[in-house]
């Protein structure tokens, strides 16, 4: 984690604080610790938002997919069908061949592969569906800096 902090101008303490915000939920949706730490450091470094703010945004992002998997309709009216349809329009299927939700790191990886083929309006609409209107800018920052994250 020290190397990650040095590479992103974020302190180990800052990264740890941000990870504490969303690590438990990230694990439940299939995001590895390494992916979580790298995503947090990337967005913190590129936006200069605090790790606390970015960690909260990621917690919301991952809670959305978890709630949808449980069959809930989100406050903004998003359902699993709408979420899935938004990603399907760019060729990303959130379910595997057995109709189970894919791991979040795989969904993000597939989304990142398609991101640059979208225009800005499409990127914004997709990010708002996936992350919600209050937290979508952090997802945009992650997608825009995906090569740095990897």
Spell out what each predicted region is.
Residues 1-149:
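Amphipathic alpha-helical interface segments used for oligomerization, scaffolding
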